[in-house]
């Protein structure tokens, strides 16, 4: 595709994005930035959440996954749905009852300052690296399609990308994010549906032919029960999906900031359940698209790219279809990647301001000043991390993110699980040590699992092991004659 056409498409999208961001975030105060003033309609948040769970990584990588993994990803997505129900009926009422700005305030109330800072710092590392990986993917794609033809270096690409994310989130925060996520969801769903339509048309498939082509393909196998050593094994994927969504959605300030913007916890529960079920069908569309892409390359004799992540971009922008397919791909990619990055930047700003600096205890004017400075700082750090990823990239992006989450979200999951399901008090100053040792032990296990466990490969279930080690470590720190954890009444507010 012509770089000029792509540039015009991107500029048009950003004009719409900035207009929505300005209208939604107009006159937003600090509460509006952090939790949307808790006035968001649940059905708007639910629609927005469908898109917020889909990043540029999903948009680009999931269609290419079908060659190696078939539809096995849906096994994990089924686990996501179960995890969403757990979040809706356990975590959401708890967070609303405590009237939290940052969900990691719960750890201070339950254990103490050390666990609070541990949770906040682990989130900071997780979200910063995860957001950087996602933006790195879109930067690579834009570099190939737009910046490279104009001989613009990668560093300029990164600077412009981060600057755009900062600009449309600096004013409205969560209030802006919800409405920009609505735009993102609409663009994503329309893009993938129309891409399926145009590719099916080029293959001369009507609806029944489309369904039979996908269902008859070896790439559409969904359930894997045969080999427990296979990374696609059902119970590995399903259980990993349950715990991954609890950790990456329920215990993630980025995702929960939208849920906490609903008027009350019952509205938030409706949002969680609706968006969780809808996500299954959206992911199914991406996998269907992947089967069609591989079917198309096979019939046309097109050599598949070296990396599965490159399949969708190569076909969509390679003049194999009408130009609208390439435009739809770019809109979908930009919508997913920039919205996810903006959400992460807002969450990082909130967590660092509230959890690390404790600035929420200051007056409104001082808080606004600190928040704006932190927002700039987070954008700068994100740009640096993206550039470093460009130097280190050597693995599938989606695997890298889930593996990363297993190491960094595991201690957070273990901390919350211990706090919610036990009433024991622990020696708070030693909690950071447990949070560091648990991922280290998991790394040793994962590196040697095949040799130690007769060929068994640890994959996404690493998150469960990590949380379990953290939980056991906290058991070793239980105080003698412990009683129920004290509750800070100042944090509790009934809704």
Residue ranges and their predicted role:
Residues 1-495:
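Membrane-embedded helix-loop-helix hairpins and adjacent transmembrane boundary segments
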């Amino acid at each position: 595709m012509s770089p000029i056409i792509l540039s015009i498409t991107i500029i048009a999208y950003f004009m719409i994005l900035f207009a929505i961001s300005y209208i939604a975030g107009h006159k937003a105060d600090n509460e509006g930035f952090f939790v949307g003033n808790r006035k968001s309609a649940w059905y708007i948040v639910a629609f927005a959440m469908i898109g917020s769970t889909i990043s540029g990584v999903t948009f680009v990588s999931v269609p290419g996954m079908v060659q190696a993994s078939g539809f096995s990803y849906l096994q994990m997505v089924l686990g996501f749905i179960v995890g969403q129900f757990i979040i809706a009926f356990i975590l959401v009422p708890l967070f609303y009852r405590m009237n939290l700005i940052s969900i990691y305030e719960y750890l201070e109330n339950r254990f103490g300052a050390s666990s609070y800072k541990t949770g906040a710092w682990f989130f900071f590392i997780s979200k910063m690296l995860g957001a950087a990986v996602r933006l790195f993917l879109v930067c690579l794609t834009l570099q190939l399609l737009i910046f490279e033809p104009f001989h613009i270096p990668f560093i300029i690409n990164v600077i412009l990308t981060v600057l755009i994310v900062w600009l449309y989130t600096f004013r409205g925060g969560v209030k802006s994010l919800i409405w920009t996520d609505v735009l993102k969801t609409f663009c994503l769903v329309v893009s993938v549906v129309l891409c399926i339509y145009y590719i099916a048309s080029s293959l001369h498939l009507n609806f029944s032919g489309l369904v039979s082509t996908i269902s008859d393909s070896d790439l559409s196998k969904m359930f894997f029960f045969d080999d427990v050593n296979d990374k696609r094994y059902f119970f590995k994927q399903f259980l990993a999906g349950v715990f991954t969504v609890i950790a990456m959605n329920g215990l993630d300030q980025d995702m929960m900031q939208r849920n906490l913007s609903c008027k009350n916890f019952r509205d938030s529960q409706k949002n969680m359940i609706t968006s969780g079920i809808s996500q299954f069908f959206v992911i199914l569309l991406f996998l269907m698209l992947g089967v069609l892409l591989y079917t198309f390359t096979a019939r046309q004799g097109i050599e598949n790219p070296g990396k599965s992540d490159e399949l969708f971009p190569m076909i969509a922008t390679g003049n194999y279809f009408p130009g609208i397919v390439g435009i739809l791909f770019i809109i979908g990619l930009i919508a997913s990647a920039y919205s996810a990055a903006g959400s992460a930047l807002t969450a990082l700003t909130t967590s660092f301001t509230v959890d690390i600096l404790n600035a929420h205890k200051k007056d409104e004017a001082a808080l606004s000043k600190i928040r704006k400075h932190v927002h700039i700082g987070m954008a700068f750090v994100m740009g640096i991390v993206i550039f470093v990823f460009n130097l280190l990239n050597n693995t599938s992006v989606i695997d890298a993110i889930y593996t990363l989450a297993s190491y960094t979200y595991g201690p957070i999951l273990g901390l919350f699980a211990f706090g919610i399901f036990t009433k024991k008090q622990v020696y708070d100053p030693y909690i950071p040590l447990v949070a560091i040792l648990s991922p280290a032990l998991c790394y040793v296990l994962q590196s040697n699992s095949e040799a130690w466990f007769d060929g068994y490969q640890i994959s996404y279930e690493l998150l469960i092991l990590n949380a379990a080690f953290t939980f056991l470590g906290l058991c070793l720190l239980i105080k003698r004659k412990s009683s129920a954890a004290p509750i800070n009444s100042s944090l509790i507010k009934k809704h």
